[in-house]
């Protein structure tokens, strides 16, 4: 019988790892601290929760991101299967219905005979057995400290991110806005809202002066240049 594997964290990486191992006949125990322990960034008890954007980036084979997705599909990826099933219109990108996507992942994991899902916080790395750590940037403090203790010479990376804002369709004046594709790729799934120079400058000034959401205790504002909050971009 194959040696069991313990996986810590049931986000995208943890769920995919559990799925791939389980499909190969390897027993998996998958630990997830939600819903027993939530963080300020979590809003759902479901597995595979998207805490930022609902876009999984490009789905075009002409670039590396899209090519990796196609390779994952051919490897029976759970994440890509659920994303394709619950995708929403986004031109050349792969975007999903957040809740339906996570619900599908949760049901697949819960229904797999080789996966045992455990709810609760793991405060230290298991001392025995094969273990995959997939707790991501929202790792609980005790486990993060245990990892740091075991790897004292490690370099700990982080960056400040923000949840993508949601705008209701009813709030947009479609007499002025129009649908178009993004970068002239795919279908016309994006709403374009035009501004005159005067309107743009007024918007920019208001954005720079706008009140910000309070920073959580575990965050600092070391932003990632490739995924920058719009207010930080405006102030530059």
Predicted regions and their residues:
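Beta1/beta-strand and adjacent pyrophosphate-binding region of the FAD-binding site
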Residues: 2-13
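Short glycine/serine/threonine-rich phosphate/pyrophosphate-binding segments
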Residues: 14-16, 141
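A short alpha-helix-loop-beta-strand transition element characteristic
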Residues: 61-65, 69, 77-92, 151-161, ...
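A structured beta-alpha segment of the ubiquitous adenosine-cofactor-binding alpha/beta core
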Residues: 64, 69, 91-125
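Short beta-strand to alpha-helix junction loop
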Residues: 59-64, 87-104, 135-142, 191-198
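N-terminal FAD cofactor-binding segment of flavoenzymes
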Residues: 19-81
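Predominantly flavin-linked oxidoreductase catalytic cores and closely associated redox partners
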Residues: 108-236
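Residues at the starts of beta-strands that form the adenosine-phosphate
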Residues: 4, 27, 156
């Amino acid at each position: 019988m194959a040696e069991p594997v313990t996986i810590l964290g049931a986000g995208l990486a943890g769920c995919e790892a559990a799925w791939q191992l389980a499909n190969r006949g390897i027993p998996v125990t998958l630990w997830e601290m939600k819903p027993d322990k939530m963080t300020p960034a979590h809003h759902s008890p479901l597995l595979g929760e998207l805490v930022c954007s609902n876009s999984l980036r490009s789905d075009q084979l002409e670039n590396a991101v899209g090519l990796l997705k196609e390779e994952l599909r051919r490897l029976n990826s759970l994440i890509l299967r659920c994303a394709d099933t619950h995708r929403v219109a986004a031109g050349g990108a792969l975007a999903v219905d957040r809740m339906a996507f996570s619900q599908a992942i949760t049901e697949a994991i819960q229904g797999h005979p080789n996966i045992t899902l455990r709810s609760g916080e793991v405060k230290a790395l298991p001392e025995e057995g094969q273990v995959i750590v997939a707790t991501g940037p929202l790792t609980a403090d005790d486990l993060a400290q245990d990892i740091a203790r075991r790897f004292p010479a490690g370099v700990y990376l982080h960056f400040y991110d923000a949840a993508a804002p949601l705008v209701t369709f009813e709030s947009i004046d479609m007499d002025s806005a129009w649908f178009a594709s993004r970068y002239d790729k795919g279908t016309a799934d994006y709403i374009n809202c035009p501004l005159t120079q005067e309107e743009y400058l007024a918007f920019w000034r208001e954005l720079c002066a706008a009140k910000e959401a309070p920073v959580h205790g575990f965050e600092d504002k070391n932003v990632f240049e490739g995924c920058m909050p719009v207010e930080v971009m405006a102030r530059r």
